[in-house]
């Protein structure tokens, strides 16, 4: 049976998350859903999967139940399909931030940086400049191991290990962005939204966020100006520009991404180890977990 995978986030002030947590958990369990929902005073970030009927029912619940006071009435969801359930369990977690930047003064609900949609961005990249004639710089806000799976052509990648490092690398590399149109991007939009707001706050001009992130770009225009796949924080590991799971897997031991060619190595033992587990190996290794707390 086909599994429906949903992702969504919203920055909005929430003051009842402690009361909501058991109620949302009970509803998800009753519907047979699995995944992770993060609740914080600044908003919601969720990745869930289940049957079509279950996911539709949950969307209706979030958008229309009086419990949520209309805060999610028009919450957009990104959808993809898989042949199996990518999550092992259902978790509803309370967090300080739905994506950790350690910049509590940022309040995206009070005003976002401008956004550019997939079709407009493709037009800019086709031409090599934006509508004002400025060169366009793609800025990857994701962790280094995610970038290694795939990214936009010629994107700036500052090899961060966690999103809270982003403000520091921007301060150190401001010259890369001056006089250009900067488009921040990430998997689903949440990190590039916070990143764009931060850049505007520190005085960097002509900053945009990619609306809906890489996954929305794939959905609308495919893989134009992009090379590789997109890492996702679940057991699918990566999606190609057609939003289909790839042959990449995540190593059970070290959590590195193991592409198809590395799976042919004698050092790869499914469920036990991979080439990156061994000292001296030069393959990709990352200290990460398949945890949406790091994502989108």
UniProtKB/Swiss-Prot annotation:
It comes from Burkholderia thailandensis (strain ATCC 700388 / DSM 13276 / CCUG 48851 / CIP 106301 / E264). The lineage of its organism: Bacteria, Pseudomonadati, Pseudomonadota, Betaproteobacteria, Burkholderiales. InterPro entries: Rhodanese-like_dom, Rhodanese-like_dom_sf, TrhO, TRHO_N. Catalyzes oxygen-dependent 5-hydroxyuridine (ho5U) modification at position 34 in tRNAs. The keyword Oxidoreductase applies. Its EC number is 1.14.-.-. Residues 132-226 form the Rhodanese domain. This is tRNA uridine(34) hydroxylase. The gene is trhO. It comes from the Bacteria. Belongs to the TrhO family. PANTHER family: RHODANESE-LIKE DOMAIN-CONTAINING PROTEIN 7-RELATED (PTHR43268:SF3), THIOSULFATE SULFURTRANSFERASE/RHODANESE-LIKE DOMAIN-CONTAINING PROTEIN 2 (PTHR43268).
